[in-house]
Each structure stands twice: as structure tokens, then as C-alpha cells.
Curated annotation (Swiss-Prot):
PROSITE patterns: RIBOSOMAL_S8 (PS00053). GO terms for biological process: translation. GO terms for molecular function: rRNA binding; structural constituent of ribosome. This is Small ribosomal subunit protein uS8. Coiled coil: none annotated. Pfam families: Ribosomal_S8.
């Protein structure tokens, strides 16, 4: 089966694993997914991730993060720009997620950045998803 939206698949796998409080999850690797996982780790939404090489495209293993009393760190993930309806924003029009408590993942000419980083570097791009 051909996957039409690998980013939505990644977000759905994270959301589902988070809902049942799994410690880790695995998904097919790509450079874009690796950049997204890197941002999620840097912003403190996941504990860690690792790239596992195989003879095909590889696998990304994501280790989810929970609070001291097992509460979820990721409360929501929402795909914004979809294959059927792309959403682009200038650096001055980038959205703030929950008043700055969440992040927007933006695909720019300088790679995947958070909304805050894109605003600082004054680059716009495709708004991939919101994470809070």
C-alpha cells in the first residue's frame, strides 16, 4: 500500500502510542521525519530518538516522554498542511500555538524549524503541524 502522507502517519503513530502510554515506537525513516524527531527532542516533547539502519530505508525509533506521575508531555498533535491542501505562511504570519506553549513545525528553505526559529531567521514556509 502506498502511503500518501508520511508526516500524518508519523504524527498518528506518536499520538496513538502516547495515548496508550507506550515507552517507544518505530516508524519508517526519512530525512524529513528525522528532522521532525530532532525538533521534538530539542523542544522536550520526546525523550530521545535513534536511527536504525537496515537494508531498506531504515527505521526511526522514538522514545516517548512522560511526567513524574506518568502524565503525557505531548497533549496534542495536529497536521496542518496536507497533500490536498498545502498551507504556507510568511515569517510575519507564522501562527503561535496556544500562545507560545506549543510549537508549529515549519518546513523552510533552511530545513524544518519551529515557528519561533523561523520568525527569528525571518523565513517562511509550509506549516507542517502543531504540537502542544
Amino acid at each position: 500500500m502506498v502511503m500518501t502522507d508520511p508526516i500524518a502517519d508519523m504524527l498518528t503513530r506518536i499520538r496513538n502510542a502516547n495515548l496508550v502510554r507506550h515507552e517507544k515506537l518505530e516508524l519508517p525513516a526519512s530525512m524529513l521525519k528525522k528532522e521532525i524527531a530532532d525538533i521534538l527532542k530539542r523542544e522536550g516533547f520526546i525523550r530521545d530518538y535513534e536511527f536504525i539502519e537496515d537494508n531498506k530505508q531504515g527505521v526511526i525509533r522514538i522514545f516517548l516522554k512522560y511526567g513524574p506521575s506518568n502524565e503525557r508531555v505531548i497533549t496534542g498533535l495536529k497536521r496542518i498542511s496536507k497533500p490536498g491542501l498545502r498551507v504556507y505562511a510568511k515569517s510575519t504570519e507564522l501562527p503561535r500555538v496556544l500562545g507560545g506553549l506549543g510549537i508549529a513545525l515549519v518546513s523552510t528553505s533552511k530545513g524544518v524549524l519551529t515557528d519561533k526559529e523561523a520568525r527569528q531567521q525571518q523565513v517562511g514556509g509550509e506549516v507542517l503541524a502543531y504540537v502542544w
